[in-house]
Amino acid sequence: MPRRPSSGRRVLKHQPLTFSPFMRLLSFASMARRDLSHPEDCQCSDEDISFDEKQKIPNLPRKGKEEQVSDSSDEEDSQEDVQADFEFFDPKPTDFHGVKILLQNYLDDKEWDLSSFVDCILEQTTVGTVVKVADDEDESVFALVTALNMARDKDNKCFRELKEFLRKVCSEKNIANNLEMLLEKKAQDVGLLVSQRVMNLPPQLLPPLYDGLFDEVSWAIEDEPTEKLRRSFRFKSYLLVTKIYKLKNPKQRKPRHGEEDIEDTVFLKPEDELFLELSSWSFTFPMRSQLVTSQEMKNYQLMGLVMAVEANKIPKFRQMLNSLID
């Protein structure tokens, strides 16, 4: 179906985003090399990519090109500069392996029908975006954002397993009831917001990514060919499953003389801090799978974070995210 035209074009200057003393480090961290169940099937590259502080990105709130140009001449910069043109695309079947790589630890180390979950994402072409590098022969997927109705595919094995996983890791009884409501009784009004990407993707891509997602949701409510489909995008709540780092022993860890304050929580994705601030409820759980990290993160544990955000908070989120990145 044809996209509605969007207006406006802005050029932003890329600067590393810092939410904690470690966030600059994390923003340039290499994507951890992880094993696939069928590695021979994967045609996507996970080569390390780094970006310098003077890169500029035209900000397009629609599918199209997000140009990333490096013009750094700082010889003392230890990061290798790479010139890349990012483009936003509708999901398509050939993105299967790239999306599967991004999502392989989405439910920690649980064995589940991830392939069917990826299929659900790729079949929904009117809402959702994948980010690639222009003219990349491998068509590696660097980012994904989409929103899936929790009831539309409720009979799919992957959604049954996802719900089972969330119930199992939710140990807080007062929140378990709220979670159950979104998983079952109110599922038709819930969008599972899936956002995964390589860790060093420039943060300036975030506002157009999320603006595009929520614009597409609004358009789908009006433009989908059947009332059933239009109804499936009238989300009242969004459910998010993501990851953060938590300090292992916060009460015992005190900054030494001359050190910066130690953060209890490090957000791998800066927008997750905004979602958490706006959430109606949330809970964390320890993860058995661990990302490859630096020495600076040795005192932190990777945790899963599940949160619910009411749809009426999304305009505020978009405003906060744009202000943050600008």
From Swiss-Prot:
Signal sequence region: none
Mind naming one GO cellular-component term on file for this protein?
nucleolus
Write the record's keywords in alphabetical order, separated by commas. Phosphoprotein
Report the superkingdom from the record.
Eukaryota
Q: Where is this region: Disordered?
A: 37-81
Where on the chain is Phosphoserine found, per UniProt?
45
Note whether DNA repair occurs among the keywords.
no
Compositional bias (Acidic residues) at which positions? 72-81
Tell me the protein family, please: Belongs to the BCP1 family.
Q: Which PANTHER family match?
A: BRCA2 AND CDKN1A INTERACTING PROTEIN (PTHR13261), BRCA2 AND CDKN1A-INTERACTING PROTEIN (PTHR13261:SF0)
Q: What is this protein called?
A: Protein BCCIP homolog
